[in-house]
Amino acid sequence: MIQGVSSPSLSGNAAQFQIGGTTPYSDVLWTNPVIGQFSTQGLPDDAHTLLPTIHNFIYDADFFVTDASKTQVLEFDINMYMNSVGMTWAHQCNHLGDGDWDIAVMSGWISTGVPCNLLDNSWNHVTIQAQLESDGSLLFQTITLNGVTANINQSYPAYTVPASWYGITVSYQMDGDSEQATNTTYVDNLSLTYW
């Protein structure tokens, strides 16, 4: 990952991500701890008073695809951990697979049936809305790609994590293709809104 990239960039401060190698379908996950342990935003929430109040999330980002023919999967995640409970709202654009948006559940990835049509050699914009429901279920609400919104409205259970895990992270992942071709993407204006 290279930060502070001025071109291509919408803000003048994008991040460059690259994948390659020799093992087909390998992936690389980049994670930013926003709240809680290791917070990069100065929000350690040491008293554990902020996380319990958060139930809604909007992940919003611009991303540049340099070569869609090599872009197997791009993944966008919101993760929350507290009280031994792990909550992951993982969304992947399975571009060279089923061509749809997939979401992660306990048994693995499932297709939403919503097409993920990437703009090649261009900026794309994604907005993901998710919610922690009152019963502790993870609600995948909507995915908006390049101005087209799809309602997902599917709920799934959380999972168990070590009691020491505490915080909210955002992640971005690139998956390699069948040849593990070198591929580069850029992310700009990434934000997480929560309440």
Task: Give, region by region, the residue ranges found by the protein language model.
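Surface-exposed loop/edge segments in extracytoplasmic proteins
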Residues: V85-W89, I110-G113, V148-Q154
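Extracellular beta-strand elements of beta-rich domains used
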Residues: V126, D188-L192
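Short tryptophan-centered beta-strand motifs in secreted/extracellular beta-sheet-rich domains
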Residues: A61, S122-S134, Q141-I143
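Surface-exposed coil/turn segments at beta-strand junctions on protein surfaces, enriched
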Residues: P52-I54, S69, L118-N121, V161-A163, ...
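Flexible glycan-contacting loops in extracellular carbohydrate-active proteins
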Residues: I152-Y186
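Secretory/extracellular carbohydrate-interaction modules
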Residues: I2, S9-D102, Y194
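Short, aromatic/His-centered strand-loop micro-motif at the edge of beta-sheets
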Residues: A104-T127
